[in-house]
């Protein structure tokens, strides 16, 4: 039943039919309801009257729009006449009258759910009177029975109502327009008296965290292992504290400093240090905080950020992960209309555009993906300095360990210099995590000091994962032992490889066994062809031991990770380092080497199919030569390998010194290295 009919029924159901004594039917008496009492406004309503027009429009637009939309009025339907619907009859009694032939005429309303029938009632004073019957729909049996009884019946269709149509139009169009008008009215006049960002609800406001006197708790003394970057930042601090010292000779303050480096190398830590040392207002935010779902928000937030920064100049603005907003234009799906590109254009203008100037605002940005940044963002005048914060070397790692170990109780036997040598490729964050894991492990074991054992176990856990359950004696354990000893022997007997630090059968992560090497003191940025080839030989040593000892049918999938790493290194030798018979060519596309998916898709290979086939052949030649060298090591030193496997099966962990002592009983390691180098040279020149 529609709301209209429902209200009608409620009103008329209580009106009885009366008959006058004179024999005529009396008119229905209607009682006029008393007028609604008007309650004077309370104190709360007077307070509501004092609300601003902004809140009033917002409440009206949202409340009325949503409320009326949720309760949309139904279409007006034809209803039973009011004067004939006051007498009701149940459906079952109506059927009894119909079976008795006392029903003369039936009119159906409201899609067959209500019927007004003329009934011949002998018991009533008026033999024929009209009653209202509520029907359960319009059953087919009822229609058939009406036809059989010869009853005259008719259905009254829905009649449109002008009032309801007007209300529908108001709900569909009026309130949304009122809501939009309220937004347009309040945005420029109420929130933007200064002519700044004019987006509603503060969407155009920058989310940068502002600190007038930054108290980050970090100084340059807390930053270790990045001396070159510290020196550049200390100059920035001098620029901000004593600008007259540099302006006297015509120098200007650098507008921007871009920190580039892998994750965890201390870029954000450097920004915290300069904020704590400079003593000037500091704004900090992430590159992702510029972009929202609304168009124009990013550019508006950039304008607001620099307006606030210029008002507080001299000051620092730190944008972390700037690649979220500063990536190369034209690479996105949206092209030049992309919201990110509009934000970047506004950032370029604010830093050094027609409206930009030397306002004493220094922008510091950090990213670990400099290859995807827009070229216009990297030019001098915007980011005058580009500081590389790379992975620390041995000395840098030792300095970082000293900083993070200052508040920890270390055993006198712990040498941080040795720990630094054992952690090549560790970033500052990795080293901090290492010292924390060692402290947790010492507390778990009930020790009051961190010993070498906790340091070693923490390194293994960070690099390889959690320690698993030891394998039971059997063929699988023996196969893993031969595999790991094969790695260690082939690496030790090949010139240019690092020394073995330990060999273990204790599972960690997905690995059933591990062989650790201790890097030398050479510069890791300068690696020779001999060292790379030795690494490939050592990587294939496990597979070679499986094939020589157990036969080719017994080779397992345990070397899958080794093969992936070996193939990747060999391909880089050919395409990036020019260490093959193809020649000293750079055959790798820089864009294809990056991590950005869009740039990799857009990068076009400039090599022919024949050159690609030559590259594959050169990679295969390098891997095949290294595999033959590894199998030769295993065949010539089978007795030493068998003894080493027996010791490893018994102890499960074999130290580097003990390993070399047992191997030296069977072979002259130095002589074997020289002979291997000579054979490798012959293969390379053949």
Swiss-Prot record:
Enzyme class: hydrolase
Residue stretches spanning the membrane: 164-184
Any one of the GO CC terms: chloroplast thylakoid membrane
Biased composition (Low complexity): 39-52
Chain positions recorded as ATP binding sites: 261-268
Cellular compartments annotated: Plastid, Chloroplast thylakoid membrane
This protein's record includes keyword Transit peptide: yes
Pfam families to which the protein is assigned, alphabetical: AAA, AAA_lid_3, FtsH_ext, Peptidase_M41
Entries under Gene3D superfamilies matching the protein: 1.10.8.60, 3.30.720.210, P-loop containing nucleotide triphosphate hydrolases, Peptidase M41
Biological role: Probable ATP-dependent zinc metallopeptidase.
Name assigned to this protein: ATP-dependent zinc metalloprotease FTSH 6, chloroplastic
UniProt source species: Oryza sativa subsp. japonica
Gene name per UniProt: FTSH6
């Amino acid at each position: 039943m529609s709301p209209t009919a429902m209200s009608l029924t409620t009103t008329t159901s209580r009106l009885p039919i009366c008959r006058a004594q004179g024999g005529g039917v009396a008119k229905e008496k209607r009682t006029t309801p008393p007028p609604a009492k008007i309650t004077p406004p309370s104190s709360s309503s007077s307070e509501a009257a004092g609300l601003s027009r902004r809140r009033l429009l917002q409440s009206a637009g949202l409340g009325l729009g949503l409320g009326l939309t949720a309760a949309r009025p139904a279409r007006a339907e034809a209803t039973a006449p009011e004067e004939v619907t006051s007498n009701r009859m149940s459906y079952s009694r109506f059927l009894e009258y119909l079976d008795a032939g006392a029903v003369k005429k039936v009119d159906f309303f409201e899609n067959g759910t209500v019927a007004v029938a003329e009934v011949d009632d002998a018991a009533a004073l008026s033999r024929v009177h009209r009653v209202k019957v509520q029907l359960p729909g319009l059953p087919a049996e009822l229609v058939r029975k009406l036809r059989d009884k010869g009853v005259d019946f008719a259905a009254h269709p829905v009649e449109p109502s002008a009032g309801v149509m007007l209300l529908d139009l108001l709900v569909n169009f009026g309130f949304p327009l009122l809501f939009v008008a309220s937004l347009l009215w309040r945005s420029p006049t109420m929130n933007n008296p200064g002519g700044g960002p004019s987006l509603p609800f503060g969407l155009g406001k920058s989310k940068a965290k502002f600190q007038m006197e930054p108290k980050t708790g970090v100084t340059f003394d807390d930053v270790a292992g990045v001396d070159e970057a510290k020196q550049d930042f200390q100059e920035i601090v001098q620029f901000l504290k004593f600008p007259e010292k540099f302006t006297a000779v015509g120098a200007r303050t650098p507008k921007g400093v871009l920190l580039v480096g892998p994750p965890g190398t201390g870029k954000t830590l450097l920004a915290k240090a300069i904020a704590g040392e400079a003593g000037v207002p500091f704004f900090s935010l992430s590159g992702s905080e510029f972009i929202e779902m609304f168009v124009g928000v990013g550019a508006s937030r950039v304008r607001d950020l620099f307006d606030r920064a210029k008002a507080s100049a001299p000051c620092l603005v730190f944008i972390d992960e700037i690649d979220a907003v500063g990536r190369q234009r034209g690479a996105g799906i949206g092209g030049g209309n992309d919201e990110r590109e509009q934000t970047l254009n506004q950032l370029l203008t604010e830093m050094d555009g027609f409206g930009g100037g030397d306002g004493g605002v220094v922008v510091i940005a950090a990213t670990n993906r400099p290859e995807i940044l827009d070229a216009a963002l990297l030019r001098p005048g915007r980011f005058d300095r580009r500081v590389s914060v790379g992975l620390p070397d041995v000395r840098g790692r030792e300095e970082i360990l000293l900083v993070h170990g200052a508040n920890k109780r270390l055993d006198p036997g712990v040498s941080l210099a040795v720990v630094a040598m054992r952690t090549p490729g560790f970033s500052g964050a990795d080293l901090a995590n290492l010292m924390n894991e060692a402290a947790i492990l010492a507390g778990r074991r009930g020790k009051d000091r961190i010993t070498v054992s906790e340091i070693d176990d923490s390194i293994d856990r960070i690099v390889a994962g959690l320690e698993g359950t030891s394998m039971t004696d059997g063929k699988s354990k023996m196969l893993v032992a031969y595999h790991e000893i094969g790695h260690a022997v082939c690496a030790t007997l090949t010139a240019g490889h690092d020394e073995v630090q330990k060999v273990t059968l204790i599972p960690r992560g997905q690995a059933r066994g591990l062989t650790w090497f201790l890097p030398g003191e050479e510069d890791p940025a300068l690696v020779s062809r001999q060292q790379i080839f030795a690494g490939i030989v050592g990587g294939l040593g496990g597979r070679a031991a499986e094939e020589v000892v157990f036969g080719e049918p017994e080779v397992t999938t345990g070397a899958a990770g080794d093969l992936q790493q070996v193939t990747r290194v060999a391909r880089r030798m050919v395409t990036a380092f020019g260490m093959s018979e193809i020649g000293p060519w750079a055959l790798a596309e820089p864009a294809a080497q990056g991590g950005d998916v869009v740039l990799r898709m857009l990068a076009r290979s400039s090599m022919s199919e024949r050159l690609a086939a030559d590259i594959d052949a050169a990679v295969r030649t390098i891997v095949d030569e290294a595999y033959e060298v590894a199998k030769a090591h295993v065949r010539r030193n089978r007795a030493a390998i068998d003894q080493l496997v027996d010791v490893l099966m018994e102890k499960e962990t074999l130290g580097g010194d003990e390993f070399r002592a047992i191997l030296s009983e069977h072979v002259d390691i130095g002589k074997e290295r020289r002979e291997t180098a000579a054979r490798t040279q012959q293969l390379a020149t053949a």
